[in-house]
């Protein structure tokens, strides 16, 4: 079973990945192709967070799964926005 501390720490990491992705998304929206590497890195961090979440989800209780599911929605939303951006 996942500990509360491990889930909280993971959610903090996800929030960091989201902030980085949002920043890069906003920059890419304004600058087009100038920072492709950073934009791609932020997409990779989102993907890694989603992959790690699958493992953690399996060992979580119902309350933790709910928190993880909400974060998963946010990560998937950002991932989709980044894919759809004409970058």
Language model: regions and residue ranges:
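N-terminal acidic leader/helix
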Residues: 2-35, 72, 82
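Short, structured coil/loop segments at alpha-helix boundaries
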Residues: 4, 61-65
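Short, charged, amphipathic alpha-helical segments
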Residues: 8, 36-47, 65-73
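Short E/K-rich amphipathic alpha-helical oligomerization segments
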Residues: 22-59
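Amphipathic alpha-helical coiled-coil segments
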Residues: 48-62, 77-87
